[in-house]
Amino acid sequence: MSFVVIIPARFSSTRLPGKPLVDINGKPMIVHVLERVRESGAERIIVATDHEDVARAVEAAGGEVCMTRADHQSGTERLAEVVEKCGFSDDTVIVNVQGDEPMIPAVIIRQVAENLAQRQVGMATLAVPIHSAEEAFNPNAVKVVLDAEGYALYFSRATIPWDRDRFAKSLETVGDTCLRHLGIYGYRAGFIRRYVSWQPSPLEHIEMLEQLRVLWYGEKIHVAIAKAVPGTGVDTADDLERVRAEMR
């Protein structure tokens, strides 16, 4: 099947300035991400950035760049700018891969594209089971609850579903009911255009989760269980050191 991958790579980062260009074993992080995405079989790969240094690094590695504005409020807004500049048709399948995931398995990039293509829905994503209490109660690990058909009922930083009987006895174990959302999305290009036309929702401001805008406006997001678990993403200097060690 045919799909396009867009990799947003914003230069500014509060916790890790110049994040796309941090060195991981001799290469900028954004180049590692580009190499993983190439393994997915995507028809076209575009790095969306607001900084010339990132553009030069990507082009030196043979990648395609789309320069975007620096004032976008969300990654989806940056995607929408690329969709318009490139003139993608409404039915083009677009996969959004984060620029700070140098260990993302190629198989899940293709998986989210295929899941979207097989369904009459505008958006798809992935999740993995949570097995540790530490992760279940960590607000940085976004949880998702699904319906019987695999569509998202809600995303939250809170621990959902709350296992009343289990947690009344102990918070040391979590059972097998919690799912962690992975930050990879598949969209049809026309859906991205619609998304950015909607006003932000109260829920997305409360949770700081932009996918809640989709549910707020009554649209569906399909969620599949990922075929592979991604390695560590890079949000902080400590994450960077872990990734460097794991990728040696």
From Swiss-Prot:
Keyword Thylakoid in annotation: no
Pathway(s) it belongs to: Nucleotide-sugar biosynthesis; CMP-3-deoxy-D-manno-octulosonate biosynthesis; CMP-3-deoxy-D-manno-octulosonate from 3-deoxy-D-manno-octulosonate and CTP: step 1/1; Bacterial outer membrane biogenesis; lipopolysaccharide biosynthesis
Top-level lineage group: Bacteria
Record keywords, A-Z: Cytoplasm, Lipopolysaccharide biosynthesis, Nucleotidyltransferase, Transferase
Chief location bin: cytoplasm
GO CC, one annotated term: cytosol
Any one GO BP annotation for this protein: CMP-keto-3-deoxy-D-manno-octulosonic acid biosynthetic process
One function term, GO molecular function aspect: 3-deoxy-manno-octulosonate cytidylyltransferase activity
Reaction(s) catalysed (UniProt annotation): 3-deoxy-alpha-D-manno-oct-2-ulosonate + CTP = CMP-3-deoxy-beta-D-manno-octulosonate + diphosphate
EC number: 2.7.7.38
Subcellular localization, as worded in the UniProt entry: Cytoplasm
InterPro entries with a match to the protein in the record: Cytidylyl_trans (IPR003329), KdsB (IPR004528), Nucleotide-diphossugar_trans (IPR029044)
Family that this chain belongs to: Belongs to the KdsB family.
NCBIfam families: kdsB, PRK05450.1-3, PRK05450.1-5, PRK13368.1
Name of the protein: 3-deoxy-manno-octulosonate cytidylyltransferase
UniProt source species: Salmonella dublin (strain CT_02021853)
